[in-house]
From Swiss-Prot:
One of its GO terms (biological process) is cell division. The lineage of its organism: Bacteria, Pseudomonadati, Spirochaetota, Spirochaetia, Spirochaetales. It comes from Borrelia duttonii (strain Ly). Component of the ClpX-ClpP complex. Forms a hexameric ring that, in the presence of ATP, binds to fourteen ClpP subunits assembled into a disk-like structure with a central cavity, resembling the structure of eukaryotic proteasomes. Keywords: ATP-binding, Chaperone, Metal-binding, Nucleotide-binding, Zinc. SMART domains: AAA, ClpB_D2-small, zf-C4_ClpX. The keyword Transcription regulation does not apply. Belongs to the ClpX chaperone family. It comes from the Bacteria. This is ATP-dependent Clp protease ATP-binding subunit ClpX.
């Protein structure tokens, strides 16, 4: 029998509380009623949904590859090929997620994970990090050298996914659209081309373990990390839309490439051969070279997009010190400015810092440690002294550990200064 329009609803349609139990706090409309407590639950659910990061949904407009590269240009010096390749790969990856459903296209678009090959300190990690920040997606870094095959002492590959979940503040659906950078991937190469009698638990075994999560699977991740236990609850995460970027130095890979190219051109004139002189042989990288190096074919197949990074020269390191928006020199300048102290560098000092990084063969990564060591005593003194107004890093202080940067108690620097000074431009002030 239908309820008459005038008939009053006596209880909450959701929880069943009567008007008396709800202390009269019930709102009704037509044939439905809701109590105050249930309305609060609904309000909180809607609020949680609206508070979710915008990246959980399709963005209004994906940055184009040119826009992504332009963003990378602000932070990374050189490495043009890697910046272009990564910009296209990231654009295509998220275009595939937000616009390329099989229902709409009739075609299932497979994801294209990326492999970056280049020396230590050439910018592999920074490229991935800056792209993730620009896309506003969670980002995690993993070290392949800590991973071992399941059942052995070490870290399970699923722990990589836990780092991404943490980066997404526990939001699994947000993490499922993130980016993972696996560093030192060359360190899990097989020990040799032939399978060893002994178990290679940190080489081929890890590659086999990584295959599924890189390709796309539902992985069960222990919430506290470590090894999985039979009765422990796990977090299920779909890796189908997670972009994996793997990087490594691959020492010796250039020789493999050169041997292959030379073998291919036996019998041809030297003028018809590819020029592999200098450090450019990595641009001719092919799958067979990676397999020869020690990566298994199945693993190489999951990383179809390749790019190379050049070894940084002294002139590149000089630019890295001062040119990017968040250059190392600019960071230290602002750090000193927080204590009301001006930081200046002799141009010869910047040259000496770049030269030292070259000698240590640490690339851009070594620049910060050189500056930290150089300025540590000054940074120790500044917070306790109101007299220090200006610090000048000289060439002598870089080259000689017994010479400290010059400390001035007044803002004025005598002119002409014996050495040319580099001063942070007004853009960074």
């Amino acid at each position: 029998m239908a309820r008459s329009k005038s008939q009053k609803i006596e209880g909450c349609s959701f929880c069943g509380r009567t008007r008396a139990e709800a202390e009269g706090k019930i709102i009704s409309a037509k044939s439905v009623a809701i109590c105050f407590e249930c309305s609060k639950i609904c309000h909180n659910l809607f609020k949680e949904e609206s508070d979710k990061p915008a990246s959980n949904k399709a963005p209004r407009g994906l940055p184009t590859p040119k826009q992504l590269k332009s963003h990378l240009d602000k932070y990374i010096i050189g490495q043009e090929d890697a910046k272009k390749v990564l910009s296209v790969a990231v654009y295509n990856h998220y275009k595939r997620i937000f616009k390329g459903s099989k229902r709409e296209t009739g075609v299932e678009l497979e994801k294209s994970n990326v492999l970056l090959v280049g020396p230590t300190g050439s910018g592999k990690t920074l490229l991935a990090k800056k792209l993730a920040a620009e896309m506003n997606v969670p980002f995690a870094i993993a070290d392949a050298t800590t991973l071992t095959e399941a059942g052995y002492v070490g870290e399970d590959v699923e722990n990589i996914l836990l780092k991404l979940i943490h980066a997404a503040n526990g939001d699994v659906s947000f993490a499922e659209r993130g980016i993972i950078y696996i560093d030192e991937i060359d360190k899990i190469a097989k020990k040799g081309e032939n399978v060893s009698i002994t178990r290679d638990v940190s080489g081929e075994g890890v590659q086999q373990s990584l295959l599924k999560i890189i390709e796309g699977t539902i992985a069960n991740v222990p919430p506290r990390g470590g090894r999985k236990h039979p009765y422990e609850e796990t977090i299920a995460i779909n890796t189908h839309d997670i972009l994996f970027i793997c990087g490594g130095a691959f020492v010796g890979l250039e020789n493999i490439i050169k041997k292959r190219i030379n073998r291919s051109f036996i019998g041809f004139s030297s003028s018809s051969c590819k020029d592999t002189g200098g450090d450019n042989s990595l641009k001719y990288l092919e799958m067979e070279d990676l397999i020869k190096f020690g990566l298994i074919p199945e693993f190489v197949g999951r990383l179809p997009v390749h790019s190379y990074l050049d070894k940084l020269e002294k002139k590149d390191l000089m630019k890295i010190l001062v040119e990017p928006e968040n250059s190392i020199v600019r960071q230290y300048y602002h750090m000193f400015k927080m204590d009301n102290v001006d930081l200046l560098f002799e141009k010869d000092a910047l040259d000496a810092i770049a030269e030292e990084a070259m000698l240590k063969n640490t690339g851009a990564r070594g620049l910060r440690s050189i500056l930290e060591e150089l300025l540590k005593d000054v940074m120790f003194e500044i917070p306790s002294s109101k007299q220090i107004k200006k610090v000048i890093v000289t060439k002598d202080s870089v080259l000689n550990t017994n010479v400290e940067p010059l400390i001035l108690t007044g803002r004025h620097v005598n002119k002409p200064w014996a050495k040319e000074l580099y001063e942070i431009n007004s853009k960074s002030n």
